[in-house]
Structures are given as C-alpha cells and as structure tokens.
C-alpha cells in the first residue's frame, strides 16, 4: 500500500475516533427504565431498539388505518426521480410503498439487523422493485454516499438511535444541499396514543435535538392520527 493511501486511512480512523468521542461526550447515564437504555440525550432517555422479531406488528393489517399510512406516504416531499433513504426500514412497510411513488428514483433501505436485511432483499426481489437498494448501516452511520439523497425519513426510529449525534452528522453528509429529514414519531403529548413512553417523542424535544445537530424544523404536520410529521432541513451544507 502506498504511503499516501496509508495516510488517508490513518486520517479516516482519526476522524472517526474524534467523531465518536464527541458523540459519547454528549450523553449522561442513569438507571435504565423498563424500555430504555439508561443513556440520556438532552433530557430524553434513548429507547431500546425494537427487535425484528416484531415484524408481524410492523406488517399488521390494521396499521394502514390506525396510522393512516397512505396519507403519510402521499405527503412525502418527493418527485418521481427523487433519491430517498428509509432509515431503520424494518420490514420495508414504507420502503416498498415509497418505491412505487418514485419509479425513476431510488430508495435506500437502511438497516442494522441482519434478519431485516435478508427480509428486505427477498421482498425487493419478489416485488421486482429494481429501485430499492438495501444498505447495512451501523449504530453511528447509515453508510450512504456523500451528497447522495434528497430525503431521509425515519418512521418511529429516531428515538431508538443509540448515537444520535454521530448518526445525524453522518446522515447530514449523505443529504444533498437543501436535503431534508422527516421524522414520524408517536405523539408524546397525547396520552391516548397507547405506545410505551420511551417510544414516543414531543415536538419540543425533537426540535431541540435536531437543532443541536444542524437541522431546522420547516413543517410540523398535524394530520396523522398517532404520529407527528416533522420535516427538517439541514442548515449546514
């Protein structure tokens, strides 16, 4: 290996170490709650990641009506040629519906769980959707190319990110200038939303966390029955 390549590799690992160290310094810790990790970011306990064993719940027949997922998908700010990323794609409930909306575009289905990745790849083949690419991410990065996506969306996922600071920094680099990030999160403010507390978020908390990482709220949609529709735009290109 050439010296120049070694230097580039060395610089990469140094920058990765620095980013991870900065990420870790952003958190405090407490005794974990029943559904939390004990890791706290800006006053919010980070929730445990939902195992892919819960795939049946993701694909339940009642979901379309309960969450009005048709309205959620049609409300995405995308065009027929948009490039988007479904972060924490799970079973691909949203991935494959969005892919049908952008026949000239592309959907990156990003997951960290191997079972989910296998499921997504199999379903993409079965549905013959060539514009879906499954990506194995990590807890600190979606592993997407720089300046590659117009929109990233997370459906009931952001609150589970183990390293939100590092992850958002990496995701910001993957977004094109003016790129947007959409969070769908169960409404913490509404006690009628029967979801465990650690798996809900308030608008105030989401705004605080995203603002701290270079994103501003540009739309607060209140049209979904159970979830916030929070569209952010990155403020630094």
Label each PLM-derived region with a short phrase:
Residues 127-139:
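Conserved SAM-binding strand-loop segment of SAM-dependent methyltransferases
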Residues 113-115:
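Conserved SAM/SAH-binding beta-strand->alpha-helix loop
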Residues 150-164:
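A short SAM/SAH-binding and catalytic strip from SAM-dependent methyltransferases
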Residues 91-103:
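Conserved SAM-binding loop of SAM-dependent methyltransferases across substrates and taxa
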Residues 23-77, 83:
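Class I SAM-dependent transferase core
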Residues 165-180:
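A short glycine-rich, Lys/Arg-flanked "PGG" loop and its adjoining helix->strand segment in the class I
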Residues 142-151:
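A short acidic, Gly/Pro-enriched loop at the edge of an enzyme's catalytic core
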Residues 80-90:
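Conserved class I S-adenosyl-L-methionine
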């Amino acid at each position: 290996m050439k010296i120049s390549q070694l230097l580039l590799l060395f610089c990469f690992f140094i920058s990765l170490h620095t980013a991870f160290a900065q990420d870790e310094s952003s958190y405090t810790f407490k005794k974990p709650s029943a559904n939390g990790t004990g890791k706290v970011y800006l006053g919010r306990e980070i929730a445990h990641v939902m195992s892919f064993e819960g795939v049946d719940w993701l694909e339940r027949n009642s979901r379309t009506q309960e969450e009005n997922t048709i309205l959620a998908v049609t409300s995405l700010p995308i065009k027929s040629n948009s490039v988007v990323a479904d972060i924490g794609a799970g079973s691909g409930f949203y991935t494959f519906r969005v892919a049908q909306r952008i026949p000239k575009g592309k959907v990156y289905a990003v997951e960290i769980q191997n079972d989910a990745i296998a499921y997504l790849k199999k379903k993409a083949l079965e549905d013959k959707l060539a514009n879906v690419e499954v990506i194995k991410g990590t807890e600190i990065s979606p592993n997407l190319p720089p300046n590659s996506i117009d929109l990233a969306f997370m459906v009931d996922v952001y609150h589970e990110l183990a390293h939100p600071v590092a992850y958002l920094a990496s995701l910001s680099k993957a977004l094109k200038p003016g790129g947007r990030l959409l969070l769908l999160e169960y409404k913490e403010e509404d006690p009628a939303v029967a979801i465990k507390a650690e798996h809900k978020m308030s608008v105030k908390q989401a705004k605080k966390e995203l603002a701290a990482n270079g994103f501003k709220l540009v739309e607060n949609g209140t049209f979904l029955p159970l979830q916030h529709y929070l569209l952010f735009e990155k403020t630094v290109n």
